[in-house]
Design a protein with these regions (language model features):
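Bacterial N-terminal signal peptides that target proteins for export
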Residues: 1-10
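Position-driven detector of the extreme protein N-terminus
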Residues: 2, 19-22
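N-terminal compositionally biased, intrinsically disordered segments and leader/signal-like regions
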Residues: 5-6, 18, 27
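Bacterial N-terminal signal peptides
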Residues: 9-17
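Sequence-structural signature of mature extracellular/luminal beta-sheet repeat domains
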Residues: 21-358
Length: 358
C-alpha cells in the first residue's frame, strides 16, 4: 500500500485533517457500481500476451466511493473481501454486487485518535483450510480469523521481532508447507516514514513465520520463531511465491522495482536480483500487490495499472487502469477473473489465464 511516501510529517497530518474534515465515506455512499462495463486499454508489449488477455477484454466496475482500498481475496463460497483502509474496515462484496461491512474497526483500536490516514488493515489471504489471514497494517500484527465470524476467535501470529513492535505488516502469502511470508514497511504508521516516533525497528523487513498453519487457535505468537529474511529493502510491499516454489517475489515501492529471491528448501532465501525495473516509469502508481497465474506469470500492480511479467522477467503487457492500483486477486467460478483494488474502486476483468488462488 502506498499513498504518501516522501511527504514530510506535517504534510501527513495536514492530509489527515483534510480527510477528517470531509469525513469518511458512509456505507450509503459506498455501493455496487452500476456504471457500464467498458473496454480495457491494453499495452501489449509481447505477442505472448495475446494468450493471456482476450482481444476484447472488458473492465467490470463492481463498487466505488472509497478513499483507498486494498487486499482483495476471493472466498471460495463465492464472494470477495477487501480492506477499506481509510474507514478502518474490511468489506464484503457478495454475488449480487452488494457491499457490506464485515468488520469495523479492523485495524487500529487504540484509545487516542489514530492521527494518520490509514487506520485499517491491508493485505489478506487464506490458509489451505480456508482461514482468513490478515496483514494488520495499523494494528501492527498478523492476525488469523479462526472462522468467518468476524467476532469469533482471532489468533495473532506475529506482532514483534526481537522485542520490538513490527512496523505495519502490509501483504502476505502462504507457502505450500504452511509457512507464512509477509512484508513490513511503515505505511500503516501515522507519518508513514522511517522517522515515525512509533517506529521501533530500524529496518523495513520481509519475514517468515515457520509452519504458521499449525499455530494453535488463540495461542500467543511464537515470537522466538519469527525469521527475518530480507532487511535491505527500502519499502517492501507486495509478495508472492512462484508455482514451482523456486522463487519469492517482493515488490519494492521505493525505488520502483520488483525483486526475486531464490527460495531454499528450508524456507529461507538466497541473494535477490532485480526482476523488473520500473524506476523510470512516471505514470501514476508504484509496485504494490501482486499475484501469479498457473504458468508462473506475475500480475503486478505498478505504474499505469497491472503489469504482466513472464517467469523470465519479460514485461509482456500492462492492463491500464489509469489510476493508482493497490492489489489484485484471482477468483470467480473458473479462477480466471482478476479483481483489482484502486484509489476509489473495485474492478474485475476476465482473462484467458487461470490464477493461483490461496
Amino acid at each position: 500500500m502506498i499513498r504518501t511516501t516522501g511527504i514530510a510529517g506535517a504534510g501527513i497530518f495536514l492530509l489527515a485533517t483534510m480527510l477528517s474534515m470531509r469525513g469518511k465515506p458512509t456505507l450509503s455512499e459506498i455501493s455496487k457500481d452500476s456504471s457500464a462495463d467498458y473496454p480495457a486499454k491494453i499495452e501489449r508489449l509481447d505477442p505472448a500476451s495475446n494468450a493471456l488477455i482476450p482481444e476484447h477484454a472488458m473492465w467490470h466496475p463492481l463498487a466505488n466511493g472509497f478513499t483507498w482500498v486494498e487486499g482483495p481475496v476471493w472466498i471460495h463460497s463465492g464472494y470477495l473481501m477487501f480492506a477499506d483502509i481509510a474507514s478502518n474496515s474490511i468489506r464484503k462484496l457478495d454475488a449480487n454486487g452488494e457491499v457490506s461491512i464485515w468488520l469495523q474497526p479492523s485495524g487500529y483500536r487504540g484509545q487516542k485518535p489514530y492521527g494518520g490516514t490509514e487506520p485499517g488493515t491491508n493485505g489478506m489471504t487464506l490458509d489451505r483450510t480456508g482461514r482468513l489471514t490478515v496483514a494488520g497494517h495499523a494494528a501492527r500484527n498478523i492476525m488469523r480469523f479462526e472462522s468467518m465470524d468476524p467476532h469469533g476467535t482471532v489468533t495473532i501470529l506475529a506482532d514483534s521481532y526481537q522485542g520490538k513492535k513490527l512496523n505495519s505488516p502490509n501483504d502476505l502469502v502462504y507457502d505450500t508447507d504452511g509457512s507464512l511470508y509477509f512484508t513490513d514497511p511503515p505505511y500503516g504508521l501515522r507519518t508513514q516514514s522511517d522517522q515515525d516516533p512509533d517506529k521501533e525497528l530500524k529496518i523495513n523487513g520481509v519475514y517468515r513465520i515457520p509452519n504458521a498453519l499449525q499455530h494453535k487457535a488463540g495461542a500467543p505468537p511464537d515470537r522466538d520463531r519469527l525469521q527475518l529474511l530480507i532487511s535491505d529493502m527500502e519499502r517492501p510491499n507486495g509478495i508472492a511465491i512462484s508455482p514451482d516454489r523456486k522463487w519469492l517475489y517482493v515488490s519494492n515501492s521505493l525505488p520502483k522495482k520488483w525483486m526475486r529471491y531464490p527460495l531454499k528448501k528450508d524456507g529461507t532465501v538466497g541473494p535477490g536480483t532485480v526482476f523488473q525495473d520500473a524506476s523510470g516509469d512516471t505514470r501514476v502508481g508504484s509496485p504494490d500487490g501482486m499475484k501469479l497465474d498457473t504458468r508462473g506469470n506475475l500480475y503486478a500492480t505498478g505504474p499505469g495499472g497491472i503489469w504482466i511479467i513472464s517467469p523470465e522477467g519479460k514485461h509482456l503487457a500492462t492492463i491500464l487502469t489509469e489510476k493508482a492500483t493497490s492489489n489484485v486477486a484471482w477468483g470467480g467460478k473458473d479462477g480466471s477473473t482478476l479483481y483489482a483494488t484502486t484509489t476509489d474502486a473495485v474492478l474485475s476483468i476476465h482473462l484467458n489465464a487461470k490464477g493461483i488462488q490461496p
